[in-house]
């Protein structure tokens, strides 16, 4: 039996000059706390497209996905919840905040992390990993070959692997 009952969220890890973009929430249970630009995946939307959309909606920045930095999964109140964090190369740096959702932003280095009121320790860990990535899950977009949006994320730089995998 197939089930699509999943709370699917995404975050944008945007690095510039060794610092990460963080935002301060303006509403909800996280009001006043800091974290990555984030949000939910809409119906019919890929998680990577959602990360780019949320970044643009919250901060006015466009970017391109480089890969996945980390993932959080849990079961809360009987519902599966998955949160994917994407490393994104900024294509613009002119921040224009959505003041309804975000009250402030900043570019932070690791040295500033202890003074930040984080949304969660998981959010802090994702930001830390983004600034010092050991290895990211690289995106292989094979949508053209498949005929619909289709991406594979692998911990490799060997693109030949994809040609050897039957889809």
Regions found by a protein language model. Give the residues of each.
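Active-site-adjacent beta-strand/loop module that shapes the phosphate/pyrophosphate-binding cleft
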Residues: 73-95, 106, 112, 126-133
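Nudix hydrolase/Nudix homology domain
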Residues: 101-167
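A structural signal for short, well-ordered beta-strand segments
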Residues: 12, 68, 86-88
């Amino acid at each position: 039996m197939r089930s699509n009952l999943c709370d699917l969220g995404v975050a944008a890890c945007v690095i510039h000059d060794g610092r990460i973009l963080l935002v301060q929430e303006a509403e909800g249970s996280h009001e006043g706390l800091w974290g990555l630009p984030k949000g939910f995946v809409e119906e019919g939307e890929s998680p990577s497209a959602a990360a780019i959309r949320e970044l643009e909606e919250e901060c006015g920045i466009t970017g391109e996905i480089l890969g996945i930095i980390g993932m959080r999964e849990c079961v809360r109140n009987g519902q599966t919840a998955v949160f994917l964090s994407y490393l994104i190369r900024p294509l613009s740096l002119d921040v224009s905040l959505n003041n309804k959702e975000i009250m402030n932003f900043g570019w932070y280095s690791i040295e500033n992390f202890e003074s930040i009121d984080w949304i969660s320790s998981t959010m802090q860990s994702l930001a830390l990993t983004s600034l010092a990535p050991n290895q990211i899950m690289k995106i292989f977009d094979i949508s053209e070959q498949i005929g619909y949006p289709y991406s594979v994320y692998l911990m490799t730089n060997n693109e030949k692997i994809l040609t050897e995998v039957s889809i």
